[in-house]
């Protein structure tokens, strides 16, 4: 469980999005970088559709409220826990009382903070992806508590051969 101390840009919960609701005027939403989502899921041995925090801008600071495992993927940021550098595109065990700091995107636009077990977020139309402009979910704010799903089952084995990523552009 994490507490948002500060956010330097925009951040919201995202998963692989919602399909089948365009006829109702609702876009797919979901993570902007499917590969970063799949990478985070692989690092934590969980479903690629697990909810992660998508960070757009310059990251933020998070107080670790209980021991947890996180993964950092997507656009590289400078990352540290209690001022000790953390590798990007890797998983890390954080301890209660640590201060996780993510700053300065080095490349790209979308960074992801994954929590083992996934973040707890409301599911709307089969997805936990926020789409604030449509009134679904909201951007994260200081003092928000980012909790793990209550269902703390053992990690599941995922077959990535069946993971279908959408085509971003065709040639």
Predicted regions and their residues:
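Single conserved hydrophobic/aromatic residue that forms the stacking wall/gate
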Residues: 162-171
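Short, acidic Gly/Pro/Ser/Thr-rich loop/turn segments
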Residues: 11-12, 109, 120, 155
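Intrinsically disordered, low-complexity linker/loop segments enriched in Gly/Pro
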Residues: 71-142, 147-150
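Intrinsically disordered, low-complexity, positively charged segments
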Residues: 1-77
